[in-house]
């Protein structure tokens, strides 16, 4: 396939960016931001803290989105000028610079196009992710830890801060489970389709006969709770247990009972936190995780009712979504979107944007049915 002419490529980027601006309705966003700025300037705003939080949060989001789109428009205009300059002066270094900026601009517009699909009620939230080892023994525990690293590397590549809330180590190697937050807007919307079972096929490094092993790990993604969600948990509905934090191989890492396990009695949901320094901090974090799980449970119940009215079924937590084959060949393939790559090393190092973008489109198509 012949490479696209730079001028045609720039026209295509201009058309796509104009389409994004139309979908987002930039003039309406500016009007709403101006109205919220007037509200934020009102000295009496914080007389109602909940409304104040809503106003300031929405204003911050709108301002960031407007800056992002306006910044892309300016970058596109600058690249056009750069190409004109390179051609007028027959300047190859300037042309090379313009081509590199055009490639970066295309990636930024690709990302923004995906962002326009994230219009669900909770899509703009931060993501709370839990990874659990499933069938496969020590290989499954090792696989769960590999997945944890994959998602942390993905977040790092995008500059998203992460916070590990809890890690339960397996006896021999790997982890039984881990929970972490990705502290960036829209990461719930981006990662929601990662929810499900991930299957690994490889030669087991723990088998002295070097046999092929299949192992499974589950990924659970829920939105981080906000105060406006009103997830109230009465004290008589929970049981709180404390224990000592443990590290790899079951080794104790704390001499005090600072780790906290909270059981929600009506639902049986159990959450733990042992990564904070004090029992009080661990309890507060565990309660936040429990609230997020209850919010997701409420959301799933509402989705199930809607699906029942439509005569549909909802995807269960245990649904296998992706295969990672390292032997006898190299292939990562998503079973829903059909996206695949032989670059298994890159995927396991966090290069999963192609899968995440396709997952966003797949989820939006399902929700529009």
UniProtKB/Swiss-Prot annotation:
InterPro entries: PCRF (IPR005139), Pep_chain_release_fac_I (IPR000352), Pep_chain_release_fac_I_sf (IPR045853), PrfB (IPR004374). The modification N5-methylglutamine is found at residue 251. Belongs to the prokaryotic/mitochondrial release factor family. HAMAP family: Rel_fac_2. Peptide chain release factor 2 directs the termination of translation in response to the peptide chain termination codons UGA and UAA. PANTHER family: CLASS I PEPTIDE CHAIN RELEASE FACTOR, PEPTIDE CHAIN RELEASE FACTOR 2. This is Peptide chain release factor 2.
């Amino acid at each position: 396939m012949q490479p696209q002419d730079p001028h045609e490529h720039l026209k295509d980027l201009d058309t796509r960016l104009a389409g994004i601006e139309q979908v987002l309705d930039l003039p309406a966003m500016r009007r709403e931001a101006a109205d919220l700025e007037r509200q934020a300037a009102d000295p009496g705003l914080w007389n109602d803290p909940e409304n104040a939080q809503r106003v300031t949060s929405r204003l911050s989001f709108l301002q960031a989105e407007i800056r992002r789109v306006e910044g892309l428009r300016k970058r596109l205009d600058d690249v056009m000028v750069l190409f004109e300059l390179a051609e007028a002066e027959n300047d190859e270094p300037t042309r090379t610079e313009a081509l590199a900026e055009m490639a970066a601009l295309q990636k930024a517009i690709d990302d923004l196009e995906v962002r326009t699909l994230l219009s669900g009620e909770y899509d703009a939230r931060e993501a709370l992710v839990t990874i659990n080892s499933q069938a496969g023994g020590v290989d499954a525990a090792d696989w769960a830890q590999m997945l944890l690293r994959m998602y942390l590397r993905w977040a790092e590549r995008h500059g998203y801060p992460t916070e590990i809330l809890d890690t339960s180590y397996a006896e021999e190697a790997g982890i039984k489970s881990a929970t972490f937050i990705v502290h960036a807007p829209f990461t719930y919307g981006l990662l929601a389709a990662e929810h499900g079972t991930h299957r690994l096929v490889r030669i087991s490094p723990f088998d002295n006969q070097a046999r092929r092993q299949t192992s499974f790990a589950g990924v659970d993604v829920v939105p981080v709770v906000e105060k406006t969600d009103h997830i109230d948990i009465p004290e008589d509905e929970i049981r709180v247990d404390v224990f000592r934090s443990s590290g790899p191989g079951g080794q104790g890492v704390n001499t005090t009972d600072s780790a906290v396990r909270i059981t929600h009695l009506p639902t049986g949901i159990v959450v733990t936190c042992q990564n904070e320094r004090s029992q009080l901090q661990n309890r507060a974090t565990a309660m936040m995780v429990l609230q997020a799980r209850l919010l997701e449970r409420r959301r799933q119940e509402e989705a199930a009712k809607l699906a029942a009215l439509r005569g549909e079924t909802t995807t269960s937590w245990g649904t296998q979504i992706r295969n990672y084959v390292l032997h006898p060949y190299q292939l990562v393939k998503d079973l829903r979107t059909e996206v695949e790559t032989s670059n298994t090393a890159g995927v396991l190092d966090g290069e999963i944007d192609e899968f995440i973008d396709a997952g966003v489109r797949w989820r939006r198509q399902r929700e529009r049915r």
